[in-house]
């Protein structure tokens, strides 16, 4: 699989081409330390609230070096190695790795000017199995039952396929 591009717009275009029509694909452009970025995740698989808390906590601990960062690679290095982000954050370098982490329920921060992303372990997966509905016995066909909200059903289905 190809490496991530240092251009944020190219990475977002690839992701939108792959997942843009999915109802649960979430992409939000942000600015961190004067650097454009984007948060990408699957709603229902990753906790958006946990992600915002994690990022706000890390960003609120400003150091003088963070105010003078020249670009995405420096912001990446400072966030991943010199901030209060937990150990469950790790670098993402390829498109294959990015899609694997997204479909595993992780959120990824992409930065303009950096050919890597930061994956955050903020999964909020529903842990129930997909099983046959108790009230409907089928002799033929599919025996899976999806009785939750659409985004919960999508996350269960993504986990089942994975």
Feature-to-residue mapping (PLM):
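Membrane-embedded alpha-helical signal segments
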Residues: 1-162
């Amino acid at each position: 699989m190809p490496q991530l591009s240092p251009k944020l717009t190219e990475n977002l275009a690839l992701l939108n081409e792959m997942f843009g029509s999915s109802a649960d694909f979430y992409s939000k452009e942000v600015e961190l330390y004067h650097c454009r970025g984007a948060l990408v995740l699957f709603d229902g698989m990753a906790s958006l609230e946990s992600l915002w808390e994690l990022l706000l906590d890390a960003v609120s601990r400003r150091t003088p070096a963070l105010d003078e960062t020249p670009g995405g690679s420096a912001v990446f290095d400072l966030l991943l190695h010199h901030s209060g982000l937990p150990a469950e954050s790790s670098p993402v370098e390829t498109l294959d790795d990015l899609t694997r982490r997204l479909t595993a329920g992780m959120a990824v921060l992409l930065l303009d000017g950096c050919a890597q992303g930061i994956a955050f372990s903020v999964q909020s997966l529903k842990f129930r199995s997909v099983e046959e509905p108790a009230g409907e016995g089928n002799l033929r066909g599919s025996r899976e039952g999806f009785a939750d909200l659409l985004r919960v059903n999508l996350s269960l289905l993504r986990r089942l396929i994975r």
